Amino acid sequence: IPAAYEVPMSEGLPCFWQKLTEGRKRYDFTLTPLAGGAENEFNLFCVADPQCQNTTNIARFNNETVPDIAAQVAASTLPCYGITLGDIGWNTENTDYTNDVFPLMKKAMQMDKVGLPLFQLMGNHDNKVIAVSKNDYTVAHDIAAQRNFEYIFGPVNYSFDRGNVHIVAMDNIIFPSHKDYSLGFRDDQVEWLRQDLSYVPKDKMVIFCVHIPMRASNNQNVQAVLELLKPFAEVHIMSGHTHYAENNTYDSHYEHVHGAACGAWWHSTINTDGTPNGYAIYKVKGATIDNWVYKATGFDPDFQIRLYRGSDIF
């Protein structure tokens, strides 16, 4: 999606893709110019790990997270966009919940509810559970595991522009099975990213969205991806997965590991490190992130830290 054009919407979610049909060579699309041209300033909402396993979890997401995001969008004077950072659903070793959960989560995240175009990104728990041993794993298994997600939400690797920013979303999970998944990128993904970034001016900021934190890992093709990002003036990596908050810097990259919207898997209202359930809001100005805040669900944006006396009983 070019920076100076609206995000096309369908069924309440961004719709920038079409399913390919064998034998069809032409795919048409329409772009609508933004009234004021490309936006020099905007807010980007990053929502990690809704991780809803059942209707009880979805009800909490609908009643807590969704209206909280909508209220922040309504209070903003800037254009607002959003992206999830994976684990929208929650598969388990023996049961695949994603067929039931995905359609309900798609409804929960529509623009008329959250107030902004909310792009989607795949996490390890969004893969379809396929019975295959790690030794028998092939690229075909990894691709097959992402088909349920693609059917509901669209591609797992894509990019779009807003303002002077190039935003990339990628599936960084190698998925032989529910237990054996690992951080990494297939060779074809690295080549796709290389081609994608070849069209992006080096003075643009790149926001690179994945599920599993990168942390300068030596896992499959991670270093190759980081090398592709290195030439850009400012790079922010947005990730989730951990259910705790963390910040990492390496090379010219700043990685934001986000606390989960579901906290500790909807068992309470906090993550495993005590961070409240929530999401992040980034204020983008030109080709830099001017400011950001972790927005705790149900609290004012100024609510950022709380200390307890260690000798007290709670």
Task: Describe the function of each predicted region.
Residues 6, 11-14, 20-96:
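N-terminal active-site segment of His-dependent metallophosphoesterases
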Residues 9-20, 26, 48-51, 66-71, ...:
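Metal-dependent phosphoesterase/phosphodiesterase active-site architecture
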Residues 42, 80, 157, 164-165, ...:
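Alpha/beta-hydrolase fold active-site loops
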Residues 44-46, 82-84, 120, 208, ...:
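Residue-level marker for buried hydrophobic side chains located in beta-strands
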Residues 49, 86-87, 123-124, 211, ...:
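Active-site glycine-centered loops adjacent to acidic/histidine catalytic or metal-binding residues
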Residues 93-194, 198-200, 223-238, 247-284:
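Extended active-site neighborhood of metal-dependent phosphoesterases/phosphodiesterases
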Residues 197-217:
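Short acidic, glycine-rich surface-loop motifs adjacent to enzyme active sites
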